[in-house]
């Protein structure tokens, strides 16, 4: 059994911070569950280009408001209770509205190791 708290993960190397977001990676590849689980905060008033070419992701909004724009497609509002699934490695822009940082629960498959960072194309590489 694995038991962790958000606070203990937040105060460890499992917390990754960037200009637009921070992610607390509570479950990673080395936990051998076949997926990873993160609590990610998207900072208010930001836009982040993301294209997970090597991973599928499902995201549940717990708080805040924003939108996701699929490149070449539609834009969808995000608010608490919204689930979106990037089941086709969708290239997208994620925006958190001003005064509305978003807190999201995220699941990745394959799981990430925790060492990944977005490259210039918004991609996480596959890392062993």
Swiss-Prot record:
It catalyses: (2S)-4-acetamido-2-aminobutanoate = L-ectoine + H2O. Keywords: Lyase. GO terms for molecular function: ectoine synthase activity. Catalyzes the circularization of gamma-N-acetyl-alpha,gamma-diaminobutyric acid (ADABA) to ectoine (1,4,5,6-tetrahydro-2-methyl-4-pyrimidine carboxylic acid), which is an excellent osmoprotectant. Belongs to the ectoine synthase family. NCBIfam families: PRK13290.1. This is L-ectoine synthase. The lineage of its organism: Bacteria, Pseudomonadati, Pseudomonadota, Gammaproteobacteria, Vibrionales. The gene is ectC.
